[in-house]
Amino acid sequence: MTKFSEPIRDSHVAVLAFFPVGAHAGPLLAVTRRLAAASPSTIFSFFNTARSNASLFSSDHPENIKVHDVSDGVPEGTMLGNPLEMVELFLEAAPRIFRSEIAAAEIEVGKKVTCMLTDAFFWFAADIAAELNATWVAFWAGGANSLCAHLYTDLIRETIGLKDVSMEETLGFIPGMENYRVKDIPEEVVFEDLDSVFPKALYQMSLALPRASAVFISSFEELEPTLNYNLRSKLKRFLNIAPLTLLSSTSEKEMRDPHGCFAWMGKRSAASVAYISFGTVMEPPPEELVAIAQGLESSKVPFVWSLKEKNMVHLPKGFLDRTREQGIVVPWAPQVELLKHEAMGVNVTHCGWNSVLESVSAGVPMIGRPILADNRLNGRAVEVVWKVGVMMDNGVFTKEGFEKCLNDVFVHDDGKTMKANAKKLKEKLQEDFSMKGSSLENFKILLDEIVKV
């Protein structure tokens, strides 16, 4: 890692993680670790729920990262029906919880907080930072496309609301969004009531982010250049900070691989394997899991399927026995490392930003089935903007539809084009990390913004 000169400062950074979605807290911690290593005299107080912290801090961390467990905001005895309910309860309680915990951390550390480094969802951090006379730096856990959609919420609602718009109509009135359609935008941006908890929080975020000293995302400059330019016109400072894990390699001996995925992959030919995973929040419904299994079995494509144990009951009877030589189904897999394996041929994904970025960094094409939030925007980028993958017809898995997508990638000429385009994006990412690229300079700018007093 490039060494930066250590500033002589007495900084205390409060890091506020968004726990209900692991795709948010993990990348924020990764950046925090990198910042802590670059500025060892700065204290980073990392606030997150006990359960989330337990999974994130399973290994050692720098001494200047102080871990603080906070309440999840769910009243004792409350029965939750879906993940969104947990998100809403947490967002409602978060301002009170964080104010109290930050005050306690200041006493414990003996330093006033000088910077708030938070998930962008926490719009109220702008007010807390002002109260503390601290700077606010926000992390958006998605791509430039979804951030742009949120920052243009008012214009999108005004423009679409003025006419009987087709869901297929493109967003040509927003620079950089010309290839995206109305149907790709998250519902909370366009259609949902802004008085309900989650859409209201996201709308308040869109109004608050221009107050932040800096906003950064996990990405690299050449992935969405026009959108980057657009966002720099809306925000005080906008930075792409590509995670180091995308380029670093882990030896098989060092890797956590409890189910032997790497050993299995080592027996397969180059670019032949389909990897299937849909993140940590939601899986496709049972009938689609059946369709995936049927499509895999019929296609004969080798596969590694990361599927939660509770959902394995939905697999067709006898599927695991019949496909024992063809593939493996495991409750967890080392996704980042597997995607880099030479045998990997395609990533079958929900198109969450982290998954998309991991595929891009590995030069692996994608088959997408968007599920929620920014997934449709990312899927559109994969299929139409970057041309590195294909989406499921009508956004759902069917046996025939999945087989067609597998053939598109592994058999037809379209697959060769996807692979070539994916390779080009991988090379652009590698160049971005070189001395000629912007990643190191952007990280230095972020570091200076966060540790200044």
UniProtKB/Swiss-Prot annotation:
Pfam families: UDPGT
Superkingdom assignment: Eukaryota
Pathway, per record: Flavonoid metabolism
Active-site residues (renumbered): H24 (proton acceptor), D119 (charge relay)
Classification via InterPro entries: UDP_glucos_trans (IPR002213)
SUPFAM superfamilies: UDP-Glycosyltransferase/glycogen phosphorylase (SSF53756)
Phenotype upon loss of function: No visible phenotype under normal growth conditions, but mutant plants exhibit altered flavonol glycoside patter.
Amino-acid positions noted as binding UDP-beta-L-rhamnose in the UniProt annotation, renumbered to this chain: T280, A333, H350, N354, S355, E358
Any Gene Ontology biological process: flavonol biosynthetic process
Tissue specificity statement from the Swiss-Prot or TrEMBL entry: Expressed in leaves, flowers, siliques, and stems. Expressed in the shoot apex.
Keywords, ordered alphabetically: Glycosyltransferase, Transferase
EC number: 2.4.1.-
Positions of an anthocyanidin binding: H24, H150, A373
Single GO MF annotation: quercetin 3-O-glucosyltransferase activity
Enzyme class: transferase
Functional note: Flavonol 3-O-rhamnosyltransferase that catalyzes the transfer of rhamnose from UDP-rhamnose to the 3-OH position of kaempferol and quercetin. Possesses low quercetin 3-O-glucosyltransferase activity in vitro.
Name of this protein: Flavonol-3-O-rhamnosyltransferase
Gene that this polypeptide is encoded by: UGT78D1
